[in-house]
Design a protein with these regions (language model features):
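Hydrophobic h-region of N-terminal signal peptides that target proteins for export
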Residues: 11-19
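Exported/periplasmic ABC-transporter solute-binding proteins
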Residues: 20-270
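Bacterial N-terminal signal peptides that target proteins for export
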Residues: 1-8
Length: 270
């Protein structure tokens, strides 16, 4: 009996040490989630963490369906999503793991250096259609956006468009990387991406919300709040799984985890 009890204890410990966790959702959070998960697995070799994107809405839907343990989100969970969880007798916890600046990007050859929030609203709503209307070349503006399931799509709509609708002819991209690629190949293009995705292939534009003070999207400007388009990034998990996910969440909030976040182009919470 004692041998059997010891065997059961050993098997229980093995199942804990060899635990697997699934993280799914926001493409904005994806790069830093992958990096922190890799470091976590290096420190805990018996733990496997899988990280996949798809968008905030996809991640939260997966959390509702119990096909992920943690949902990455670049927007707060919606009331309707919370109600679905509560109707199933469950509860969800929210953790802010980082902050992100949303950069407005254009083709590198574009001479325009800055735009106001109102100009951005008019561009993404189709009221401004040519770059010459904002001091640029006589060239049609090609608007790239994220698809509607994206938290970045919803945040940009809320912060920049003041909850007005995007123009019907904007080109919806399935992932942030697709916006970078499309904007880098299209001279009249404009789009928006998380700061960590910015590369020399595109040009970032300075933005002003008051029409006077312009700021470029950098970690420093986002941290000191001179750059206006900044939002929190979230991890959501089912409260009943707290014990399982806590070690990973504690790691991303630790000094090591927050250091990874800062080096990756995000703004730490601590």
């Amino acid at each position: 009996m004692k041998v059997r009890r010891n065997l059961l204890i050993a098997l229980s410990l093995l199942s804990i040490s060899a635990s697997a966790q699934r993280i799914k959702g926001s493409d904005t959070v994806l790069p830093v989630a992958q990096q922190t998960a890799e470091r976590f697995m290096n420190q805990h070799p018996d733990t496997r963490v899988t990280v996949t994107g798809g968008g905030t809405g996809v991640g939260i839907s997966a959390l509702l369906d119990n096909t992920t343990d943690i949902a990455m989100a670049s927007r707060p969970i919606k009331f309707s999503e919370k109600m679905k969880i509560k109707s199933a007798g469950e509860d969800v916890a929210e953790i802010v793991v980082a902050y992100d600046a949303l950069a407005v990007v254009a083709h590198p050859s574009n001479p325009v250096k800055q735009l106001t929030r109102q100009q951005l609203e008019d561009i993404f709503r189709g009221k401004i259609t040519n770059w010459k209307q904002v001091g640029g070349d006589d060239r049609k503006i090609v608007v790239y956006s994220r698809e509607t399931s994206s938290g970045t799509y919803e945040f940009f709509k809320e912060s920049v468009l003041k909850n007005k609708n995007y123009m019907a002819s904007s080109l919806s991209m399935p992932a942030t990387g697709a916006i970078i690629q499309s904007v880098s190949q299209t001279k009249g293009a404009i789009g928006y991406v998380g700061l960590a995705y910015v590369s020399p292939r595109v040009k970032t534009l300075s933005v002003s919300y008051d029409g006077t003070h312009y700021a470029t999207p950098t970690v420093e400007n986002a941290t000191n709040k001179t750059y206006p388009i900044v939002r929190p990034l979230y991890y959501y998990y089912n409260v009943k799984n707290k014990e399982q996910v806590s070690p990973l969440i504690q790691f991303i909030l630790s000094s090591d985890g927050q250091d990874i976040i800062k080096k990756s182009g995000y703004i730490p919470v601590k």
